[in-house]
């Protein structure tokens, strides 16, 4: 008997999942390749050096019900940020063999480019190619440095698209720090902010998760101290002018359409939740730091 073609089997199972869920096949494929990349990180010797953050972390919380995203973002700690060294690390990670998932990664043609996270932190974006049966899929991963995570990172079980595939357990950001970083971006960019996903994600986390206010403030303080946040007496973020701006309202509607969000969700409602929960925290922070 010849060697089993796991890739072909997975393709069929993903087609069945598409029919069951209504999600587009290419989206499920991208999610599957991300999952199998994360599996290789999780079984590598570098498991504790890469903390999952961003859209893939939010997906880990809510599975296919989360905001559709195919981003993979890590914060690296206790590891060199030298790009040549990181390339060798990723070659090793991508070279891990897992016959059962049908995926292989091209370890010989990894490219990279420098990135800057929130104007301050140098990071690296890696580009590489994944293969499964006849499918060739281009991928990228962002690696950032220098942020603080409060409370300390915990391990999570990443949701699997298909049963009977090797499971994924890896280190991840705290949700409090996810909110803190997104809130920092809102305050920093203020009226020039077009990142609707940050407003959406903060709203979802603040309304769907039970987060302790004291712990959330600790995360906000740690992030603001680390990223530096200057007092802004002319802040527009919490004003009616900001919320009702016609361009921003249109950006919000286009964003919801882009992510195929079916429920009614106005930007005014989102901003009311963010204002009620987070405005007192930045006021407390500024009061204690002026």
Predicted segments with their positions:
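Structured mid-to-C-terminal alpha-helical surface segments
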Residues: 1-50, 60-68, 72, 76-290
């Amino acid at each position: 008997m010849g060697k089993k073609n796991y890739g072909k089997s997975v393709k069929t199972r993903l087609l069945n999942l598409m029919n069951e869920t209504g999600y587009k096949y290419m989206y499920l494929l991208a999610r599957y390749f991300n999952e199998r990349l994360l599996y290789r990180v999780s079984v590598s010797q570098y498991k504790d050096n890469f903390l999952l953050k961003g859209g893939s972390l939010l997906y880990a919380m809510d599975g296919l019900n989360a905001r559709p995203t195919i981003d993979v973002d890590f914060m690296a700690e206790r590891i060199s940020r030298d790009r040549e060294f990181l390339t060798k690390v990723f070659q090793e990670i991508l070279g891990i063999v897992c016959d059962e998932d049908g995926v292989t990664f091209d370890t010989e043609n990894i490219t990279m480019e420098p990135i800057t996270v929130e104007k301050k932190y140098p990071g690296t974006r890696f580009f590489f190619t994944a293969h499964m049966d006849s499918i060739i899929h281009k991928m990228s991963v962002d690696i950032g440095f220098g942020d603080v995570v409060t409370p300390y990172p915990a391990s999570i079980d990443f949701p699997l698209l298909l049963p009977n595939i090797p499971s994924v357990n890896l280190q991840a950001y705290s949700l409090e720090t996810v909110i803190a970083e997104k809130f920092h971006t809102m305050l920093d960019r203020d009226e020039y902010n077009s990142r609707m996903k940050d407003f959406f994600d903060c709203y979802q986390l603040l309304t769907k998760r039970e987060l302790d206010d004291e712990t959330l403030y600790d995360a906000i303080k740690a992030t603001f101290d680390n990223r530096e946040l200057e007092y802004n007496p002319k802040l527009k973020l919490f004003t009616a002018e900001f919320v009702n701006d016609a361009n921003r309202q249109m950006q919000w509607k286009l964003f919801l359409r882009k992510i195929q969000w079916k429920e009614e969700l106005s930007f005014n409602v989102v901003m009311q939740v963010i204002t009620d929960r987070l405005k007192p925290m930045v006021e407390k922070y500024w009061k204690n730091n002026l």
